[in-house]
C-alpha cells in the first residue's frame, strides 16, 4: 500500500479472508464489489473483469516485449516427491523431467495429480507435458488416501453448507448417478465450479466432484 501511495497508482488493495475458494473469479467479484454473478453468467455481466497475477504479468510482457507465454512456474510437491521444488520451465516440458529434477518419486507413490490438491486431475502416467494452465504436479503415497467402499450419503448437509455456489450437492449426486438430465439442469449443475469442497467435507468419502463432472458431460451431450 505504501508503494502504491507513493507512486499515486490508481490501485486499491482489498484485504480478504483466507478462505477456500476465495480466489474463484465469481467469489472475488462478490467479496470485493458486493455484486453477485447471476447463474450461468460471467463477471462481465456485472461489469467486472478478473485477472490473476500470472495473467497480468503475461499481458504486460506481451505488450512491452511482444513475448508470448512460453514459460511456467510449476510447484512439484507431495509426500511422494523426493525433493519438492518450485521449477520454472518451458511450456511443453515433460512432467517426468520435472520429477527427475526433484529426485524422482519415492517408493510407494500411489497417486499423481496435475494441478492442485482440490481441483487437480489424477494422471495415470508422468508422460504428459506442462500446459499453460499447469500450476502444480503433486504425488502422494498410498497410505495417505482414505477411501470407503460403496459410500452412502448420510444426509448430513455438510456439502450444502460449504458450496460456494449455493448448490445442493447431495441431490446433484443422485441425479448424476441416475442419469437424470432434466433434474441436473434444474439443479444448475453447470454452475458447479468443481472446487472439491463438497468432496473434501463429506464424512462418507463420496466422490461428489467426480460425479458432477460426469453429470455435466451428460447434460452437454443431451443439449448437443
Sequence positions of predicted segments:
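Hydrophobic alpha-helical positions that pack around
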Residues: 1-95, 101-106, 116
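Iron-sulfur-cluster electron-transfer modules
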Residues: 1-12, 16-33, 155, 189-190, ...
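Ferredoxin-type iron-sulfur electron-transfer modules in oxidoreductases and energy-metabolism complexes
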Residues: 135-150, 160, 164-224
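Active-site gating/interface segments in enzymes
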Residues: 21, 28-36, 103-154
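Residue-level preference for well-ordered alpha-helical positions
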Residues: 99-100, 203
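Conserved active-site and cofactor/substrate-binding residues in soluble primary-metabolism enzymes
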Residues: 23, 50-58, 68-71, 90-93, ...
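Short alpha-helical segments in extracytoplasmic peptidoglycan/chitin-binding modules
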Residues: 92, 97-99, 112, 163, ...
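A short beta-alpha structural unit
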Residues: 116-120, 157-161, 199
Amino acid at each position: 500500500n505504501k508503494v502504491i501511495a507513493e507512486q499515486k497508482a490508481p490501485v486499491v488493495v482489498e484485504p480478504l479472508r483466507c478462505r477456500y475458494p476465495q480466489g474463484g473469479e465469481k467469489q472475488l467479484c462478490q467479496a470485493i464489489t458486493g455484486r453477485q454473478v447471476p447463474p450461468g453468467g460471467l463477471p462481465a455481466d456485472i461489469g467486472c473483469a478478473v485477472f490473476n497475477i500470472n495473467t497480468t504479468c503475461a499481458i504486460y510482457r506481451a505488450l512491452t516485449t511482444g513475448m508470448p507465454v512460453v514459460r511456467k512456474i510449476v510447484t512439484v510437491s507431495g509426500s511422494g516427491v523426493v525433493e519438492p521444488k518450485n521449477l520454472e520451465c518451458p511450456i511443453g516440458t515433460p512432467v517426468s523431467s520435472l520429477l527427475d529434477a526433484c529426485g524422482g518419486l519415492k517408493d510407494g507413490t500411489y497417486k499423481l495429480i496435475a494441478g492442485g490438491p482440490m481441483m487437480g486431475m489424477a494422471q495415470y502416467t508422468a508422460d504428459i507435458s506442462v500446459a499453460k494452465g499447469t500450476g502444480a504436479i503433486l504425488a502422494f503415497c498410498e497410505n495417505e488416501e482414505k477411501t470407503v467402499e460403496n459410500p452412502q450419503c448420510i444426509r448430513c448437509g455438510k456439502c450444502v453448507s460449504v458450496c460456494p455456489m449455493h448448490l445442493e450437492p447431495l441431490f446433484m449426486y443422485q441425479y448424476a448417478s441416475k442419469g437424470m438430465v432434466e433434474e441436473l439442469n434444474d439443479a444448475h449443475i453447470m454452475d458447479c465450479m468443481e472446487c472439491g469442497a463438497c468432496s473434501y467435507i463429506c464424512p462418507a468419502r463420496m466422490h461428489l466432484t467426480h460425479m458432477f463432472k460426469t453429470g455435466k458431460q451428460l447434460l452437454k451431450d443431451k443439449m448437443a
